[in-house]
């Protein structure tokens, strides 16, 4: 009965309204709205009530109706319901709607313009969705709206000027979108607005002065944009403003003194702009100010004395400016409330004043990256509220006081890179809240105190590079939260404490480069989270404990250079290895099959052990393997066929084993192979011709085997080969003429074989031969080719123990580079010229016909008799032949001279310029430039001049310290880059230069720019290098060029592209340093030399060019100009050594990596006069939050969390590359490994989303 009554009442109420159309309209509209909203089928449907069976829609989830009895929908609150789908235009039909909240869902698509029909709307909340498109300008008609919050979406385009019509607006929140364009000056008409939130967009242009009219404004934040211009003084009129945040923009000029008139201001952040000038004293008048952050600008002068009187100030952050002076003794004289004082990187000098102890409320003190000297004052340890103390990168000295025990709230103690010495006080045990202890690169000595184990909150300990001695305290095992223990490069002795196995959170354990002994404790097997185990360069011994098999998360292990033995099987529990190094130990037994389970393993080093058995076939499963070193073991059997699947192999070293069988023909399928070392084994049979398909081979060492047959002509295919060692085999037959094609050979050893025939004259074509030419202990006959004397770099020549005849060519004696010469035990004769006297007699023994210094003097009479014995007829014949030969050569030289002179003048013409239209002629047009095979066809001088309009400026695409670069589009459709070298000499006539450039031209790598050819004109002083053209310019252009044509490109240079470029750069440098023999030092790595092809792949240019030019210039040439164009990239040691090394290249590469991530130039003004990019990155990387966030180029934002992590990892690698000491920098190969690790794990974060 009761339900029936209720139903009748409900019907009467509705019929009494007389408004069935209105009811049906709102009901129908709600049902239509629902059609565009999608709920998660895995969860309870929050809109299950929204259906036509339930016409009481006022009770539906999120629906609110008015209380007038008309049942009109006035509010829809669907926030946080996990909705997907889109916003339906039907929302615009709720005529009486006052409040619409669709925030915190996953809605996509545009904001419908139909929402502008909601003329009664007072609040519109669409924030935290995935909405796209532009903000509809029609929203400017919502004149009753008070709160408009549509941020945290994917919205693009400009902020509509029509929003200035919303005169009742109190809150406008458009943060965290992708909005562009200026802040509309029309927003200055919003006189009632209280909150204007525009941060984290791409807004640009100046801040409109009209915003000073928004008199009710209490919050204005436009941080994380691209705003420029000056801060308008009119903002000083905002007397009600409490929060002003303009951080991370490009604002310039001085800070207006009028900002000191905002009497209610509590928070002011202008950090990370380009502001300059003095800090206005008027800011001290802001009596309510609690936070002042002016860090990372170009501010100068001293900190105003008045700041220390601001009684309400809690946070003062002035880091990374160009301030001067020292900390005043008046600090905190009238302000004991200061909690955060951050003055890092402000060029402070002098000592830390004892008066700092007056800041009794101080929680964070950061004075790092300055020039502070003296000791840490005892009074500093009276700041008992301190949680963070950063004093690193100064020149502090003295000891660490035991009074540090007073700082019982301390969580971060960072003192690295100072000159602190003495013992680490045992009183540190009182710091029970300490989480991070960084003391590395100081002069601490003595033992690490046992009491450190009482600091039970410690997560990271880094004491690398000190003089700590004694044993590692077992008490460290009590640190249950520890994830980093880095004690490398100290003087620690004794065994590894078994108690370290209790540190179950350890990720990195690095105890390398000490004097540790004993065995590895079995308790290390409990370190289940361990990722890196570095124990190399110690004296550890014994078997590996079986428990290590439990370390399934290891990615890097290095136990090299110890005395360990037994089996390595306990290390094979992980299938996540990236690098595995146990070289130089005494490991025995067979190589475990399980090593093949780490499919991302890049480098496997097992050399110099006592491993036995066969090479595991399972290694063929490691498709990422690039280096395999099993040298100096006792391995037997054949090389397993499965290794043919490791297509990325670049280095194979199996030297000094007992491997047998023929050399596998399938090795020829490893197209990336650059180094093959199979020396001192038991390989037999002839060389497979397939092996010579490995055209990237740089080192081929097969000596000490039983290989036979002849050396095939196909060896000439190995044009990149630097080292060829076939010593101590059974090769026979003659030396192939194709050997002369190995023009990059640095070392050639063919001794102790059975080679016959004459030494081919083509051997003289090996102009890069330097280390050795050893043909000893063979059966070579005939004369020594005089062409050997042209090998101007050769240091060792051994032709001993052959059957050579004739004289020793005088040109050999003229070889200035030759240090070792041995032609003993041949059948040589004649008189040695005086040039040979610099070698000992042993070099010529066993040649009965030889005489002269350093051998016995020639018998003049016997010599004359022998000459007479030739007969007068012979002498006449020989003289006649010599005379005719000399005349013939003279005629040939004269003819060639006139021909070249004729061709030259036909090429350059006779006008005032070298490149007139008359320069083309039938003969000249067919004279090609030198080229290295990279071009489609011969490139002619005239082609280049025509394509560039005689090197006109309109075709110039770049310039630098070495010259200008032009783009040349040739008639054959090919595009090349032409570099005009600014050098006064005719470089191409310099044989040394010509040889070096030809060598560089033969270098091929996917991340190096190909040098295609060169030419010069002596009369015009022009030297041209022809390079492969890179369509997308340099990474410098993309990061720093302000031309409008690049604006769209900047948006395309996303994090994925930048990371790929960073890896490509590192791979190019690694190739130069580790895969070229001899290694090539680039000398001028910078972002403008990192070029991008059409696929945005990185190619390093100008490699080797600086060295070639500086070594081939006259004494008046200032070679340092090669570094003048690279300021900001130069390693610090170059300033005093003036010597470029691989480690100085690594430093320059580190700077480029920082540039790629931060988007800043190495000399960016944000660093200040006394701080460089390295210290700036280091300063911000070591702190969390906004300071770290500013390291990432704003153009990359927003990034996903794991992308930000990857960016920070790249910066950490860059910091390692830019260590002050070259010895502490990684090799380019190690840096490349680290970057590849970041790149290969870049998608891991997607799985967590």
UniProtKB/Swiss-Prot annotation:
Catalytic activity, EC: 2.7.11.1
Binding residues annotated for ATP, in chain numbering: 957-965, 979
Protein's membrane topology: Single-pass type I membrane protein
Catalytic activity: L-seryl-[protein] + ATP = O-phospho-L-seryl-[protein] + ADP + H(+); L-threonyl-[protein] + ATP = O-phospho-L-threonyl-[protein] + ADP + H(+)
GO molecular function: ATP binding; protein serine kinase activity; protein serine/threonine kinase activity
Signal peptide range: 1-18
Tissue specificity annotation: Mostly expressed in siliques, seeds, developing embryos and seedlings, detected in flower buds and roots, but not in leaves or stems.
Keyword terms: ATP-binding, Cell membrane, Cell wall biogenesis/degradation, Developmental protein, Glycoprotein, Kinase, Leucine-rich repeat, Membrane, Nucleotide-binding, Phosphoprotein, Receptor, Repeat, Serine/threonine-protein kinase, Signal, Transferase, Transmembrane, Transmembrane helix
Residues that bear Phosphothreonine: 948
Transmembrane segments: 877-897
UniProt domain Protein kinase: residue ranges: 951-1240
Subcellular location: Cell membrane
Residues listed as glycosylation sites in the UniProt record: 77, 117, 213, 228, 248, 298, 309, 334, 369, 393, 406, 454, 537, 553, 558, 565, 693, 708, 779, 822
Phenotype upon changing residue 160 to L: In sgn3-5; altered CASP proteins localization in Casparian strips
Disulfide bonds: none
Keyword match Isomerase: no
Known function: Together with GSO2, receptor-like serine/threonine-kinase required during the development of the epidermal surface in embryos and cotyledons. In coordination with GSO2, regulates root growth through control of cell division and cell fate specification. Controls seedling root growth by modulating sucrose response after germination. Receptor of the peptide hormones CIF1 and CIF2 required for contiguous Casparian strip diffusion barrier formation in roots.
Name of the protein this chain belongs to: LRR receptor-like serine/threonine-protein kinase GSO1
Taxon lineage: Eukaryota, Viridiplantae, Streptophyta, Embryophyta, Tracheophyta
Gene that encodes it: GSO1
């Amino acid at each position: 009965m009761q339900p029936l009554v209720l139903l009748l009442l409900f019907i009467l109420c509705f019929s009494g309204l007389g408004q069935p159309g209105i009811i049906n309209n709102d009901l129908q509209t709600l049902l239509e709205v629902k059609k565009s909203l999608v709920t998660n089928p895995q969860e309870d449907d929050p809109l299950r009530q929204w259906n036509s069976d339930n016409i009481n829609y006022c009770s539906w989830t999120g629906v609110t109706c008015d209380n007038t009895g008309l049942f009109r929908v006035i509010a829809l609150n669907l926030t946080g319901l996990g909705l997907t789908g889109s916003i339906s235009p039907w929302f615009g039909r709720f005529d009486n709607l006052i409040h619409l909240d669709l925030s915190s869902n996953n809605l996509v698509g545009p904001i419908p313009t139909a929402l502008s029909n909601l003329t009664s709307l007072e609040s519109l909340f669409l924030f935290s969705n995935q909405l796209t498109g532009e903000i509809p300008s029609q929203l400017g008609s919502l004149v009753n709206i008070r709160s408009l919050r549509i941020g945290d979406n994917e919205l693009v385009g400009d902020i509509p000027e029509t929003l200035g019509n919303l005169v009742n607006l109190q809150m406008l929140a458009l943060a965290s979108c992708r909005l562009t364009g200026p802040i509309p000056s029309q927003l200055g008409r919003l006189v009632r607005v209280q909150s204007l939130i525009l941060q984290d967009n791409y807004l640009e242009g100046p801040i409109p002065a009209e915003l000073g009219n928004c008199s009710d404004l209490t919050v204005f934040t436009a941080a994380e944009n691209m705003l420029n211009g000056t801060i308008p003084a009119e903002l000083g009129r905002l007397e009600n403003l409490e929060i002003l945040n303009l951080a991370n923009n490009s604002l310039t000029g001085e800070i207006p003194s009028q900002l000191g008139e905002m009497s209610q201001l509590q928070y002011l952040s202008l950090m990370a702009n380009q502001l300059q000038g003095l800090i206005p004293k008027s800011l001290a008048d802001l009596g309510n100010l609690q936070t002042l952050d002016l860090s990372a600008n170009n501010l100068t002068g001293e900190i105003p004395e008045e700041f220390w009187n601001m009684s309400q100030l809690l946070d003062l952050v002035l880091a990374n400016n160009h301030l001067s002076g020292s900390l005043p003794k008046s600090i905190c004289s009238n302000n004991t409330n200061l909690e955060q004082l951050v003055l890092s990187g402000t060029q402070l000098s002098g000592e830390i004043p004892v008066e700092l102890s007056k800041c009794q409320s101080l929680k964070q003190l950061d004075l790092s990256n300055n020039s502070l000297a003296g000791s840490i004052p005892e009074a500093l340890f009276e700041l008992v509220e301190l949680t963070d103390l950063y004093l690193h990168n100064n020149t502090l000295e003295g000891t660490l006081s035991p009074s540090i025990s007073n700082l019982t709230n301390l969580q971060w103690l960072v003192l690295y890179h100072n000159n602190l010495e003495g013992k680490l006080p045992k009183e540190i045990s009182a710091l029970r809240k300490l989480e991070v202890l960084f003391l590395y690169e100081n002069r601490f000595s003595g033992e690490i105190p046992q009491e450190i184990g009482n600091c039970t909150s410690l997560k990271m300990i880094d004491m690398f590079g000190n003089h700590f001695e004694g044993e590692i305290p077992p008490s460290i095992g009590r640190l249950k939260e520890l994830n980093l223990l880095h004690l490398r490069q100290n003087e620690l002795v004794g065994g590894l404490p078994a108690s370290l196995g209790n540190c179950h959170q350890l990720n990195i354990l690095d105890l390398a480069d000490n004097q540790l002994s004993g065995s590895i404790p079995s308790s290390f097997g409990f370190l289940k989270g361990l990722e890196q185990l570095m124990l190399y360069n110690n004296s550890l011994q014994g078997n590996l404990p079986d428990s290590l098999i439990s370390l399934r998360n290891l990615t890097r292990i290095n136990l090299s250079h110890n005395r360990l033995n037994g089996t390595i099987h306990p290390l094979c529990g992980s299938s996540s290895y990236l690098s595995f190094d146990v070289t130089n130990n005494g490991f025995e037994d067979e190589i475990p099959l399980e090593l093949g389970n780490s499919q991302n393993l890049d480098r496997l080093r097992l050399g110099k052990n006592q491993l036995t058995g066969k090479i595991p076939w399972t290694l063929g499963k490691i498709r990422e393997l690039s280096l395999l070193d099993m040298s100096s073991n006792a391995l037997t059997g054949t090389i397993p066929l499965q290794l043919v699947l490791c297509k990325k192999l670049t280095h194979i070293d199996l030297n000094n084993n007992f491997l047998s069988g023929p050399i596998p023909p399938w090795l020829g399928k490893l197209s990336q192979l650059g180094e093959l070392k199979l020396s001192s084994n038991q390989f037999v049979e002839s060389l497979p011709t397939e092996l010579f398909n490995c055209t990237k081979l740089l080192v081929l060492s097969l000596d000490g085997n039983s290989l036979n047959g002849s050396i095939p002509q196909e060896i000439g295919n190995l044009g990149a080969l630097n080292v060829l060692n076939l010593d101590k085999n059974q090769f026979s037959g003659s030396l192939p003429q194709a050997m002369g094609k190995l023009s990059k050979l640095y070392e050639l050893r063919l001794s102790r074989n059975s080679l016959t025939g004459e030494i081919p004259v083509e051997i003289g074509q090996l102009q890069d031969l330097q280390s050795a030419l050893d043909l000893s202990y063979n059966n070579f006959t005939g004369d020594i080719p005089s062409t050997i004397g042209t090998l101007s770099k050769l240091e060792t020549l051994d032709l001993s123990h052959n059957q050579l005849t004739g004289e020793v060519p005088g040109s050999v004696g003229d070889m200035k580079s030759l240090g070792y010469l041995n032609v003993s035990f041949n059948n040589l004769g004649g008189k040695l010229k005086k040039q040979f006297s610099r070698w000992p007699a042993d070099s010529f023994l066993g040649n009965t016909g030889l005489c002269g210094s350093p051998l016995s003097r020639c018998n003049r009479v016997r010599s004359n008799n022998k000459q007479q014995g030739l007969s007068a007829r012979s002498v006449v014949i020989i003289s006649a032949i010599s005379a005719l030969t000399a005349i013939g050569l003279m005629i040939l030289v004269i003819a060639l001279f006139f021909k070249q002179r004729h061709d030259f003048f036909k090429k350059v013409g006779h006008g005032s310029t070298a490149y007139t239209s008359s320069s083309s002629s039938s003969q000249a047009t067919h004279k090609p430039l030198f080229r290295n095979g990279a071009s489609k066809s011969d490139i002619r001088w005239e082609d280049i001049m025509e394509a560039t309009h005689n090197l006109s400026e309109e075709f110039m695409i770049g310039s630098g310290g070495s010259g200008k670069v032009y783009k040349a589009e040739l008639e054959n459709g090919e595009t090349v880059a032409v570099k005009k070298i600014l050098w006064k000499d005719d470089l191409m006539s310099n044989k040394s230069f010509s040889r070096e450039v030809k060598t560089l031209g033969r270098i091929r790598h996917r991340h190096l720019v190909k040098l295609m050819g060169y030419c010069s004109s002596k009369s015009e002083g022009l030297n041209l290098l022809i390079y492969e053209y890179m369509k997308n310019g340099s990474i410098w252009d993309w990061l720093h060029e302000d031309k409008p044509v690049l604006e769209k490109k900047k948006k395309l240079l996303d994090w994925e592209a930048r990371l790929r470029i960073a890896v490509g750069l590192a791979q190019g440098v690694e190739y130069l340093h580790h895969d070229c023999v001899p290694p090539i030092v680039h000398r001028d790595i910078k972002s403008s030399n990192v070029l991008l092809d059409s696929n945005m792949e990185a190619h390093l240019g100008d490699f080797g060019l600086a060295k070639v030019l500086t070594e081939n210039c006259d004494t008046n040439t200032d070679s340092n100009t090669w570094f003048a164009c690279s300021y900001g990239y130069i390693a610090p040691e170059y300033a005093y050594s003036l010597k470029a090394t691989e480690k100085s290249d690594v430093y320059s590469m580190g700077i480029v990596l920082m540039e790629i991530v931060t988007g800043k130039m190495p000399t960016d003004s944000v660093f200040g006069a006394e701080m460089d990019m390295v210290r700036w990155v280091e300063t911000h990387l070591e702190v969390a939050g906004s300071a770290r966030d500013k390291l990432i180029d704003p153009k990359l934002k927003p990034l996903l969390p794991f992308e930000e992590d990857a960016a920070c990892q790249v910066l950490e690698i860059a910091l390692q590359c830019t260590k002050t000491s070259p010895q502490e920098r990684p090799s380019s190969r190690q840096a490349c490994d680290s970057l590849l690790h970041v790149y290969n794990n870049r998608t891991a974060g997607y799985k967590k989303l």
